[in-house]
Amino acid sequence: MEAYFDNSATTKVLDCVKDAVVDAMCVNYGNAAAKHRKGVEAENLIREAKKAIADTLKVQEKEILFTSGGTESNNTALIGTALANRRAGKHLITTGVEHPSIYNTMSFLEEMGFEVTYLPVDHLGHISLEDLEKAIREDTILVSVMYVNNEVGAVEPIEAISQCIKKKNPKTLFHVDAIQAYGKYKIRPKKQGIDLLSVSGHKIHAPKGVGFLYIRDGVKIRPILFGGGQQKGMRSGTENVPGCVGLGVAAREAYKDFDARIEKLYTLRERLIAGLILLGGVTINGSEDRTNAPQIVSASFEGVRSEVLLHALEDKGVYVSSGSACSSNHPGISGTLKGIGVKKELLDSTIRFSLGDLNVEEEVDYAIGVLGELLPVLRRYQMK
């Protein structure tokens, strides 16, 4: 049996998405910038995909910018707004537990002369609104916060954060990294006061290499890619029509039967947590209840290194992560785990399980059974 619990790293492409992508590659394969019929057909496909995405957020089609994925969306949001608004100020705010595509972009902006404030989080991974309010200044041009933490599943109070920002400085823009939240929460940028929102396709059963950035109409932002002026000059380069089409289909699917899907994920999560706790010597990081995201469980296993456990599980057909897949090729202790106060001896003993729509109860039970067999053996071996 196999059990794939690394859906926060990437997901399997749905059959309906695959069919739409193949059609866009092999039938409607024109360049969307071309003036002939094939080009017009491709352009129409992109427009339909934008509409599908915009409908899930209740925003305008023109506010959706297609990108190559979450990293580009985050880079565009941060660098683009920083450069466009630097006359108003050079101060930005984020948290100490962001994805590398935020953290490293902020580091780049610091090298460019911008000042960045990094807010701490509590033991559950949440920022303090009081800390945020104190950090906002007259020259603060952007606040960037992750909706759902990619390692422990902490959910930030996005609407309350927006209200805090706009009350203290109405001119400050609010960017949300929603890469782990899109498809798991009903996101309404207009209602929640979000100015920019990043999403990645391959987290929701779309192909890799495509994502989007929601940019509220009226936000001052500069492009970071230059060339032929595609997407109204905001993102030059030949449009990835198959990717955009696949993302549009996946976006629609992500919000079909929404309540039932999320209930299923929470039920699986609760079953997994209960099984892990019964194993003994296991600590759940972050919240165990439904204030946490429905798909992520971070667990620390006493006496076992995470990489050893990961490969032992892999040999049994259970696939998990020992950290953010976007940075797992660069060994190091997670800043998120440190930030929420995980004990030093458990920092290198932590595994992330991330559930998806295709998982079933039998897979959870199988994984727990495998862990029950492996842990005593691995602990004895590592204690020698």
Name every feature range the model reports, one short phrase each.
Residues 1-384:
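Pyridoxal 5′-phosphate
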